[in-house]
Regions:
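A structural signal for short, hydrophobic/glycine-enriched beta-strand patches
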Residues: 1-112
Length: 112
């Protein structure tokens, strides 16, 4: 099955950063247009009360989308590995921002 993976980005005590908000909005539009489930990924730093994945999922609670929060990982590699190992993801559209697109593509390719 193909998924839409939303990579984590900063959140501030439960409020999404501009970058995370943009990723989630784009993912929701894409997933709805292509009838795909969404996986939000991203853990939390020491002292944080909320995970990046949890904040992203909460943004989508009112949408009629199939959303899973995988509250693990602190970087692109660990987030993609968690999606593969915990949820069996082998095919996905990965939502990130333009500055991270090439690096994300290379990491995804390396990790299978």
């Amino acid at each position: 099955m193909k998924y839409v993976i939303v990579l984590g980005a900063a959140q501030y005590d439960g409020r999404p950063s501009r970058i995370l908000r943009g990723r989630v909005r784009f993912a929701a539009e894409y997933a709805a247009a292509h009838d795909l489930p969404i996986i939000t990924v991203g853990g939390k730093l020491p002292g944080d009360r909320f995970t990046e994945a949890g904040v992203a999922k909460r943004m989508l609670d009112d949408d009629p989308l199939n959303v899973t929060a995988l509250e693990e990982g602190l970087d692109t590699r660990s987030e993609l590995i968690a999606a593969r190992e915990k949820l069996g993801v082998t095919e996905a559209v990965i939502i990130t921002d333009p500055l991270h697109r090439l690096r994300t593509f290379l990491i995804a390719r390396q990790e299978g």
